[in-house]
């Protein structure tokens, strides 16, 4: 388990990245709505260009940081990764939200490219522009759900957690397994993000 100072640092990092992610998504949603509904051509163009930069330089880094620091928090504190239902549910929400975010960066780039090429009329790229609003709303609800789980911590302990509560001393193999899980998750995520940045980053589509 992590020491007190390390645990507080990890918690601070996790909360900061999670709050930053939520705030960036809220800003993204405001820009998406403005870009969809405004008739001011310069404003629409600026909104979609800003959305692409917010995505790659704020939302993506904060989402990855939130997921990784969440794993560190789970594996390095008594909460554990599989001991409480709320931890598992929050992890699932975060993983799904991060994966969907990375997959749906292509429409953002497509609309930003369209804005660069010239003024966007009301009907131009409308399906993609509507998708950006819908994606942002879904992401906002997912992050609010994750925040709610962190605050209320519902549903109690899993069967695995109850067994560990009775016999809290971990076997060496259990320690090796949890550390291996963390390293594998980190490696897979880093490789996926690196591949996506290379193949579908800013104007890479």
Where in this protein do the model-derived segments appear?
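Polytopic transmembrane helical bundles with strong interfacial aromatic enrichment
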Residues: 1-205
